[in-house]
Amino acid sequence: MTWRVLVHNDAINSFAAVAYALVRVLSMPVEHAAAAARQAYESGVAEIGAYTEREPAEAITARLQAFGLNASIEVAA
C-alpha cells in the first residue's frame, strides 16, 4: 500500500508560504517547492510525496499542517 501526501490550495496561504513550508519541512529544493505550490494553486492539489509506510506520511502531513497548510494523506489507487 502506498500513502500519498497532498497539499491543497486554500484562501489563507500564499504561494510563497506554501513553497517556504515545503522547503522547511521536507528540505525540498526551492525549484521543486515552487512547482508543487504552483500545481496546488492551479489545480487545487499537489502530491508532495508517496510513502510505503503510513507513519511517515502522517508525520509529514502533521508537520505541514503545523505550518498552517491544508495537507492530507490518501491511499494511492
Task: Annotate each predicted stretch with a short phrase.
Residues 1-77:
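Terminal domain-initiation and capping elements
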